[in-house]
């Protein structure tokens, strides 16, 4: 059994991680930390996990965490940096669900996250944990920077076109919408039920901190085809709990051929990417609580603009599920181990 440690397991990504690992046949959570909830039973804070965990939150301890085979950080941005150097020096394998090690340019990270980076020396060695791109690197990685939710949906949507150099990268557009859990568990007025329900709005249109991560990832995917890449990214708030829907737009360079076949062939062997039949369009409810990304692609009226629609669950493929997918790869397991259940409908 893989001994799993979780640092900061009281938020939405933490409980999602616990939910997934509760049914994982080759993993066992042996330690979960929280300074605020130390001594409290996991099942007391999360009653849905009663009968699945006989485990209490504890104060973070480097010595205890180093006894684990893998450590997940489900902490707010900026927290993992404080412990990471000691854990890596101690030989730990770490999967960080926060943004601390995603962006390679330190000055860019500090600008968008509004704080000094506490562990810049490890950023270059972190592997960006998007399995559809970096599977081989993930296998031997010691530190995984798990992608953000919007970046996952957008990169998977554009990926086949970028790899083949079929689109004009100078004016990409991503129009994305997320459920309220994308903002985390901390209370805020915009996320109150009476504020978010029965409404739909854009936010962060002048600049969202996922933008540099997305552009970095798209450039990595496109390589020589991504020179001069620029993305206009506008996120929106959905009146739902979970889910992300991204609608992506790009100008085709010329006759791109059969776009449906391109996507189907690229993702044919990806266990967590489902290319829908031509004419079908993805719905967020079809991926709820799953690690699946569902995609459709179309060139409306054949006017030279390609439109891609990509949906994920922001807490699963957009965070904790993708983290477990990375863990499975790191330990040579089937990628879908512990995550084969379909979405709940209705």
From Swiss-Prot:
CDD domains: AGPR_1_C, AGPR_1_N. Its EC number is 1.2.1.38. This is N-acetyl-gamma-glutamyl-phosphate reductase. Pathway: Amino-acid biosynthesis; L-arginine biosynthesis; N(2)-acetyl-L-ornithine from L-glutamate: step 3/4. InterPro entries: AGPR_AS, AGPR_type-1, NAD(P)-bd_dom_sf, NAGSA_dehydrogenase, Semialdehyde_DH_NAD-bd. It catalyses: N-acetyl-L-glutamate 5-semialdehyde + phosphate + NADP(+) = N-acetyl-L-glutamyl 5-phosphate + NADPH + H(+). SUPFAM superfamilies: Glyceraldehyde-3-phosphate dehydrogenase-like, C-terminal domain, NAD(P)-binding Rossmann-fold domains. GO terms for cellular component: cytoplasm. GO terms for biological process: L-arginine biosynthetic process. Transmembrane segments: none annotated. Pfam families: Semialdhyde_dh, Semialdhyde_dhC_1. The gene is argC. The keyword Amino-acid biosynthesis applies. Catalyzes the NADPH-dependent reduction of N-acetyl-5-glutamyl phosphate to yield N-acetyl-L-glutamate 5-semialdehyde.
């Amino acid at each position: 059994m893989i001994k799993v440690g979780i640092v900061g397991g009281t938020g939405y990504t933490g409980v999602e991680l616990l939910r997934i690992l509760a049914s994982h046949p080759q993993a066992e959570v042996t330690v979960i930390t929280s300074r605020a909830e130390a001594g409290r039973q996991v099942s007391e804070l999360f009653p849905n996990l009663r009968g699945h965990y006989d485990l209490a939150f504890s104060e973070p301890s480097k010595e205890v965490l180093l006894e684990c085979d893998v450590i997940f950080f489900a902490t707010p941005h900026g927290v993992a940096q404080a412990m990471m150097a000691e854990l890596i020096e101690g030989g730990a394998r770490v999967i960080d669900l926060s943004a601390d090690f995603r962006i390679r340019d330190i000055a860019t990270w500090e600008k968008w996250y509004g704080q000094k980076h506490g562990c810049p020396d490890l950023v270059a060695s972190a592997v960006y944990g998007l399995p559809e791109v970096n599977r081989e690197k993930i296998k031997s990685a010691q530190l995984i920077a798990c992608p953000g939710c919007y970046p996952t949906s957008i990169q998977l949507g554009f990926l086949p076109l970028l790899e083949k150099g079929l689109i004009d990268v100078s004016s990409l557009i991503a129009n994305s919408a997320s459920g309220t859990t994308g903002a985390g568990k901390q209370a805020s007025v915009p996320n109150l039920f009476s504020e978010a329900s029965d409404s739909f709005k854009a936010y962060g249109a002048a600049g969202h901190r996922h933008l540099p991560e997305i552009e970095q990832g798209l450039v990595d995917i496109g390589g020589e085809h991504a020179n001069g890449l620029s993305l206009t990214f506008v996120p929106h708030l959905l009146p739902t709990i979970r889910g992300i829907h991204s609608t992506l737009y790009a100008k085709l360079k010329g006759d791109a051929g059969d776009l449906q076949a391109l996507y189907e062939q690229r993702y044919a062997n990806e266990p967590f990417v489902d290319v829908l039949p031509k004419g079908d369009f993805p719905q967020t409810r079809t991926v709820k609580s799953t690690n699946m990304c569902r995609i459709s692609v179309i060139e409306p009226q054949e006017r030279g603009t390609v439109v891609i629609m990509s949906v994920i669950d922001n807490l699963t493929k957009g965070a904790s599920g993708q983290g477990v997918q990375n863990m499975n790869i790191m330990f040579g397991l089937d990628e879908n181990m512990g995550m084969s259940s379909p979405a709940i409908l209705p």
